[in-house]
From Swiss-Prot:
Organism: Leifsonia xyli subsp. xyli (strain CTCB07)
Catalytic activity: ATP + H2O + 4 H(+)(in) = ADP + phosphate + 5 H(+)(out)
Name by which UniProt lists this protein: ATP synthase subunit beta
Main location as per UniProt: membrane
Enzyme category, top tier: translocase
Length: 487
């Protein structure tokens, strides 16, 4: 079924039927309905599990029609306690989530239940939208290309983000994807004053808890809606939670006419959940065991993340790369949809340089003088050339040592090392680890600073003065302190 059909179905809810559970296989439940009231694909079903004196209502989503009045549904909660013959009610509509200002400062699950409501607190929900929706039509799309300034030097200079674009943060385990996403949540609220929607897809519950506390401390929680479907949730929840968050973001864009930031951590878990659901539904797997409709599933999500006339959803997606293999179908399928890719390198992280962005492999479609201006493009290209030349010289240095290089190459290596150190930056989220306050560097200052280093104006300053600082004024201050300590 197309999303168009699904949306139409949501707006004209069918008469609800009542069915009986025929079979339960993990999160997959087969349900028999009367012949004249079989629920449509994507319809939300409800049933109640009673264990002892405790009753819990769970939601299921119809995934297949099996024939003989049977439908196959995926449960969004654990199915422990479900029994054959149990009653299941068709809601007559798709899964819906609350939208609007009521979502700010709230934590939701995939079905729109509020997880952080105070005991006895009554929350008025005026409007709910179905999570399966059509992407904006072609004539409503915004063709303007505009830089999204982050205040992080390595990103703004070498892999600039697009307003209303899709940005991927690639990296293996433990290289700083989640920390960088948390940093961006804080910067957007502080510097742009915009609304953020955060989707926690199949990540650690501890990280979600830490994020909420950090946002409360930073005073940005009230401008953010959070939707979580964590690692311990069934695959149906992890597959749908990104759509729930995206629906909330679409309301801010389309109805309130705001620019929105959508954070998804982690888009790989969305693909992984799709693979699990596909296997549970009995589909034949494709390459590396992924679902045969991998590209289609990814497209349905990514096509809805876009700019409409005057308003945008800018999305930042953390993408786990299994075993650091970029040819894996999951990250490879995501690449096709992105406007900018920020690759986080284990090698750079091991040197203690954060954000651990690889300046040579990270890319952006707007790294072009038509979009950025001649100065920005010239400096970015020069910096990349110096870093590339340094990378090529490392083999010679490893065998023969620095002394065997020509004078020109020695200068290149020296400047490259200063640039590498200066690409690191003290971030707000890392303050608890480093004790150093975060910094925001304006784009103009970033361009001028790297231009000066590339031209050799700071060749006299020791490398360590460039480490983990914001602006060049911080470098000069640190250098004066080092000289003072050394007498």
């Amino acid at each position: 079924m197309t999303t168009a059909t699904a949306e139409a179905q949501a707006s004209t809810a069918q008469p609800a039927g009542v069915g009986r559970i025929a079979r339960v296989t993990g999160p997959v439940v087969d349900i028999e309905f009367p012949h004249d009231s079989i629920p449509g694909i994507y319809n939300a079903l409800k049933t109640t599990i009673t264990i002892g004196d405790r009753s819990t209502e769970i939601t299921l989503e119809v995934a297949q029609h099996l024939g003989d009045d049977l439908v196959r549904a995926i449960s969004l909660k654990p199915t422990d306690g479900l029994v054959r013959g149990g009653e299941v009610r068709d809601t007559g509509s798709l899964i819906t989530v609350p939208v609007g200002d009521v979502t700010k400062g709230k934590v939701f699950d995939v079905t729109g239940e509020i997880l952080n409501a105070e005991p006895g607190e009554k929350i008025e929900i005026a409007e709910r939208w179905p999570i399966h929706r059509q992407p904006p039509s072609f004539d409503h799309l915004e063709s303007k290309t505009q830089l999204f300034e982050t205040g992080i030097k390595v990103i703004d200079l070498l892999t600039p983000y697009v307003q209303g674009g899709k940005i991927g943060l690639f990296g293996g385990a433990g290289v700083g994807k989640t920390v960088l996403i948390q940093e961006m949540v804080q910067r957007v609220a502080q510097d742009h004053g915009g609304v953020s929607v955060f989707a926690g897809v199949g990540e650690r519950t501890r990280e979600g808890n830490d994020l909420i506390h950090e946002m409360e401390e930073a005073g940005v929680f009230d401008k953010t809606a959070l939707v979580f479907g964590q690692m311990d949730e069934p695959p149906g929840t992890r597959l749908r939670v990104a759509l729930s968050a995206l629906t909330m973001a679409e309301y801010f864009r389309d109805v309130q006419k705001q620019d929105v930031l959508l954070f998804i951590d982690n888009i790989f878990r969305f693909t992984q959940a799709g693979s699990e659901v596909s296997t549970l539904l009995g589909r034949m797997p494709s390459a590396v065991g992924y679902q045969p409709n991998l590209a289609d599933e990814m497209g349905l999500l990514q096509e809805r993340i876009t700019s409409t006339r005057g308003h945008s959803i800018t999305s930042l997606q953390a993408i786990y790369v299994p075993a650091d293999d970029y040819t894996d179908p999951a990250p490879a399928t995501t690449f096709a949809h992105l406007d900018a890719t920020t690759e986080l390198s284990r090698e750079i992280a091991s040197k203690g340089l954060y954000p651990a962005v690889d300046p040579l492999t990270s890319t952006s479609r707007i790294l072009d003088p038509r979009y950025l201006g001649a100065d920005h493009y010239r400096v970015a290209t020069t910096v990349k050339q110096i870093l590339q030349k340094n990378k090529e010289l490392q083999e010679i240095i490893a065998i023969l040592g620095v002394d065997e290089l020509s004078e020109e190459d020695k200068i290149t290596v020296s400047r490259a090392r200063r640039i590498q150190q200066f690409l690191s930056q003290n971030t707000y989220m890392a303050k608890k680890f480093t004790g150093v306050e975060g910094s925001t560097v304006p784009l103009k200052e970033t361009i001028e600073s790297f231009d000066a280093i590339a031209k050799g104006e700071f060749d006299h300053v020791a490398e360590q003065a460039f480490f983990n600082v914001g602006a060049l004024s911080d470098v000069e201050e640190k250098w004066a302190q080092i000289q003072k300590e050394n007498g």
